Amino acid sequence: MARVAVVGGGISGLGTALMLGRRGHSVTLFEQDTRQTGDDLDRDFFHWHRPRIPQAVQPHSLLAPVRTVLLGETPDVYTDLLARGAREYHEFDWFDEHPPHRAGDEELVTLRTRRIVLEAALTAAVRREPTVHVRRGRRVSGLTVAEGRPPRVTGVRVGAEPHEADLVVDAAGRRSPVPAWLTAAGCRPPVVDSHRAGIAYLCRWYRLRADGPRDPGRVKNGSAAPFALAGVFPSDNDTFAVNLVLSTGDPTRGALIDPAVFEAAARAFPACAAWLDLAAEPRSAVLPMAGLDNRWTALGDDDGPVVTGLVNTGDSLIHTNPTLGHGVALGLRAAQHLAAHADETAEDPTGYHTWTTQALRPCFDAQVTSDDANAQRLAESSPLTDRRAAALAACAFDDPVVMRARAQVRHLLRTPDEAYRTEEVDRHVTAWLAARPEFTPTHDGPTRDQWDALIAG
């Protein structure tokens, strides 16, 4: 069994430490923040300023791999997650009745919850785990590195105090200092592939009133205009978030910080209006997030690993813009794989690097492609032109066969080519279009003139 040092106590760090500990490894988790999540979710969510983790207060939808990994590795955490208020939503719940079951349909489940609920459940489990020692308020300041070809990381430093480890896991997040430490230690530099995402997010949180309306009706959770996306994230404990997405260069972005302006703009989208009409209680200010990139940080190159005794996971490895909701899912998948292969990874990380390239890199590439297209479309207010692609998206909400394909892609279970390019899906979309010869791709949100008038008040 390996001695493992995990740097960073976010979702990926907690999940990695817990899964390693339950496999019998001796784990020390270092987290520079002295505070940890507890049982008061609203206090921790609405009143904990966490500038290093801007995504902590942004809305989340936890995709199928989150549920699958938790049920397989830590079923008690999954039970606790539901007990704390997370809710399961099956993609076929959109329909009055689920279609006849096919293999894999049981995986098409989104967990509707705030990130803090998962963090609280993982934190509680880590506290109970005797093989995991958490050192809060202890900032890792460097690595201990032994010479070799390649060099070997032998532990971490906390101030002047060394801590030996057979394997160090960098889960310090998108601002991880580890790549710079490796270069300073004389290692070949990590290979970084970074793409700026020209997309900005603004959200506001609400809570349904106990004595008020609770059902928005049968309405999609997403709407769009040529220059903006809008959506609602139903969440735990009667909370929901309204979310707007624009180009970072949109001149109206700053005005949306005003709650009155934000809500007026959000009401121009059917998805948001249906929920705002429930007269829910606002629970937060308007929360912006921008300045993001998609970044892949490989600790290996064409000559092999740049170092042994160290791997990265979570946002330290793959940081993706949140439009597709991949972050938590990919972080827990990596934690599961690492826990199952810790001893061999400590000896030689080549297998882990190969797995991340094969299993996770395609998701990164898909996010980059999606964000490039979205950023250009939002910046240019481009109209929809691909009739069949628009029909595929619309048809999913009428046809369970197409919804299944859509859900398989969304939940990272199949690639778009695998899910959509089948004879069955093609036949169903063709029939849907034939029944709607007048169908034209369109947006359900405001025009630019309407939007500008709303922002101007």
Features from the language model and the residues they span:
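Helix-loop-beta segment of a Rossmann-like dinucleotide-binding subdomain
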Residues: 97-115, 245-249
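N-terminal Rossmann-like FAD-binding beta1-loop-alpha1 element of flavoenzymes
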Residues: 2-39
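General small-molecule cofactor/ligand-binding pocket signal
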Residues: 28, 133-135, 311
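Short beta-strand to alpha-helix junction loop
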Residues: 61-62, 105-124, 177
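FAD/FMN-dependent oxidoreductases across multiple families
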Residues: 252-358, 362-363
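N-terminal FAD cofactor-binding segment of flavoenzymes
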Residues: 19, 40-95
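Predominantly flavin-linked oxidoreductase catalytic cores and closely associated redox partners
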Residues: 128-265
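C-terminal helical "tail/cap" subdomain of flavin- and related membrane-associated enzymes
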Residues: 339-457
